Amino acid sequence: MVTIRSGSIVILVLLAVSFLALVANGEDKTIKVKKVRGNKVCTQGWECSWWSKYCCNQTISDYFQVYQFEQLFSKRNTPIAHAVGFWDYQSFITAAALFEPLGFGTTGGKLMGQKEMAAFLGHVASKTSCGYGVATGGPLAWGLCYNREMSPMQSYCDESWKFKYPCSPGAEYYGRGALPIYWNFNYGAAGEALKADLLNHPEYIEQNATLAFQAAIWRWMTPIKRAQPSAHDIFVGNWKPTKNDTLSKRGPTFGSTMNVLYGEYTCGQGSIDPMNNIISHYLYFLDLMGIGREDAGPNDELSCAEQKPFNPSTVPSSSSS
């Protein structure tokens, strides 16, 4: 017969209590997300190192609210705007949910998520703005004024892609969306990623705000070329520059997000207006989101004025124009 002494029982009880205390303190690695009065309770820090229902990762809607979206794009539904009633907060959040598990707005903690929102939406605003110097509310308040190119000069059909992304008869691949995409090969690639027939129906992007935001986030998250980083990986610090990148003055900075998206249209040409306009939107959005532009870094990290372009244009650009 096995005899258990009272001292052993006390030790076992203490061990059990200690284990429960560890679980309560968050040292159990399988704690589920709890909610108290509708708010998430996380005992392991802001986020876990993987995406799981057992982790405490916040989503974009946890820190980016509808009132902030309205502040950033306050003039988008004024009568003179060209996409009145098209863009809205819920369409953005629905689109973003597809990419949150891939790190969009959920990489590196809450502050990094907020900064990425300001950066991404700063790009969006600068590319869809109808603001000008004396516009009501200032030139930075007019983002999401457009959802399409108003007077396209061509159909943007590149026949060199006819075997992989052939142009559909009658289709026109002019700029559409929140980060406007151009050319048949871009519509084809985006359509494959988003499971939408954009090659045959590029007009879907100007008809559906969620799809338009998804196409923009896809462009932000996806390298234009396999050997290159995405704008997302540059901004959040996932990308490690090579020696050639360093010599070309490219680094994990906001400036390099402009470079990888727009190349020589914006970068490597000194302090030009297209570049400064994007920077101004980013800083303005940081201020409106309550972060402050001092967190944006020095000017040489914001600028791409002296960077060599990632993709010099010898053929139609595969990036947004």
Swiss-Prot record:
It comes from Arabidopsis thaliana. Keywords: Developmental protein, Disulfide bond, Ethylene signaling pathway, Glycoprotein, Secreted, Signal. Residues 297-321 are annotated as: Disordered. Residues 1-26 form the signal peptide. Belongs to the glycosyl hydrolase 19 family. It is found in: Secreted. GO terms for biological process: cell fate specification; cell wall macromolecule catabolic process; cellulose biosynthetic process; chitin catabolic process; ethylene-activated signaling pathway; multidimensional cell growth; regulation of salicylic acid metabolic process; response to cytokinin. Residues 310-321 have a biased composition (Polar residues). PANTHER family: CHITINASE-LIKE PROTEIN 1, CHITINASE-RELATED. No chitinase activity. Essential for normal plant growth and development. Regulates cell expansion extent and differentiation at least in roots and hypocotyls. Prevents lignin accumulation in the pith. May modulate ethylene-mediated regulation during development. Probably required to establish thermotolerance acclimation. Plays a role for controlled anisotropic cell expansion in the regulation of waving during root gravitropism and thigmotropism. Involved in the root system architecture adaptation to multiple environmental conditions such as nitrate. One of its GO terms (cellular component) is apoplast. It comes from the Eukaryota. The keyword DNA damage does not apply. Glycans are attached at residues 57, 208, 244. Mostly expressed in seedlings shoots and roots, stems, and flowers, and, to a lower extent, in flowers, mature leaves and roots. Disulfide bonds join 42-55, 157-167, 267-304. Induction: Repressed after wounding or treatment with ethylene. The keyword Disulfide bond applies. The lineage of its organism: Eukaryota, Viridiplantae, Streptophyta, Embryophyta, Tracheophyta. InterPro entries: Glyco_hydro_19, Glyco_hydro_19_cat, Lysozyme-like_dom_sf. This is Chitinase-like protein 1. One of its GO terms (molecular function) is polysaccharide binding. Disruption phenotype: Abnormal root expansion with ectopic root-hairs, reduced growth, excess lateral stems and smaller leaves. Loss of regulation of the extent of root epidermal and cortex cell expansion. Ectopic deposition of lignin and aberrant shapes of cells with incomplete cell walls in the pith of inflorescence stems. Exaggerated hook curvature, reduced length and increased diameter of hypocotyls in dark-grown seedlings, and reduced root length and increased number of root hairs in light-grown seedlings. Increased ethylene production. Exhibit also thermotolerance defect.
